[in-house]
A protein has these predicted regions:
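Active-site acidic carboxylates
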Residues: 1-113, 208
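Glycine-centered short loops/turns at secondary-structure junctions
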Residues: 69-72, 139, 165
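Internal catalytic-core helix/loop-beta-alpha segment
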Residues: 100-148
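A short glycine-rich beta-strand->turn/loop micro-motif centered on a GG-aromatic cluster
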Residues: 144-147, 167-180
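Short glycine/serine/threonine-rich phosphate/pyrophosphate-binding segments
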Residues: 151-157
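Active-site-proximal loop->helix
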Residues: 179-191
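A charged, well-structured terminal subsegment
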Residues: 196-208
Length: 208
């Protein structure tokens, strides 16, 4: 099921062409959402290890540099549960819960001072968090999504952002999951109904 797949962006663009609703749009005032870039998904001995995360990390860092230069909002999320917290359907589905304070909950990329760090125990970064309020208080109209996993937390966060009135930009070569099939399936569905598909360098050009 797992593979280290190359970032075949040009091929992906051709495949989503017949489904995507928008291309070439630019955000007005975006925030960068860095979803779950943490040790749980990067350690080869973890059952949640994502082999292609190492390929997209440089692009995630490029996006961070670009947003920081423009003093635009950056939000980091990480997946973890607190002791005694009701795990609900997530606990029944996945069994193995990452707990707050564990080594595998720690980030791979260090947030800068003033950047929001958001713990989330569910797929969506908006579910039972203050993310929507935080973004709207800052006047954010658009969210740019990078991180892992493409087909779970990134996709669910993208859909949820759309439903809450944000324009969504999904960075194809700065998101990753277990294999290319799952990654591409998310790009196809999101491009049709929820998000504008973009590349890292395209976002950097907006910001320059």
């Amino acid at each position: 099921m797992k593979e280290k797949y190359p970032l075949r962006v040009e091929e992906w663009k051709k495949k989503i062409e017949k489904y995507e609703r928008h291309r070439g749009r630019k955000p007005s005032f975006p925030a960068l959402l860095v979803v779950d870039v943490q040790k749980f998904f990067f350690s080869p001995d973890s059952h949640a290890y994502i082999p292609s995360l190492s390929l997209v990390l440089p692009n995630i860092n490029k996006l961070l540099q670009g947003f920081r230069k423009k003093n635009l909002p950056v939000v980091f999320t990480y997946y973890a549960w607190k002791e005694g917290e009701d795990k609900g359907s997530m606990g029944r589905w996945w069994k193995d819960a990452v707990m707050e304070g564990e080594e595998r909950a720690k980030p791979l990329v260090a947030p800068h001072r003033g950047e929001k760090i958001l713990r989330k125990p569910h797929y969506s970064a908006f579910y039972k968090t203050d993310l929507e309020e935080y973004l709207k208080d800052k006047g954010v109209k658009d969210v740019v999504i990078c991180g892992v996993m493409t087909h779970l937390c990134c996709e669910t966060t993208a859909r949820d952002a759309f439903m809450r009135g944000f324009d969504v930009y999904f960075v194809m070569d700065a998101t990753a999951t277990f294999n290319e099939e799952l990654h591409l399936s998310s790009l196809l569905t999101l491009s049709h109904g929820f998000a504008v598909m973009v590349e890292t360098e395209e976002v950097i050009r907006w910001l320059s």
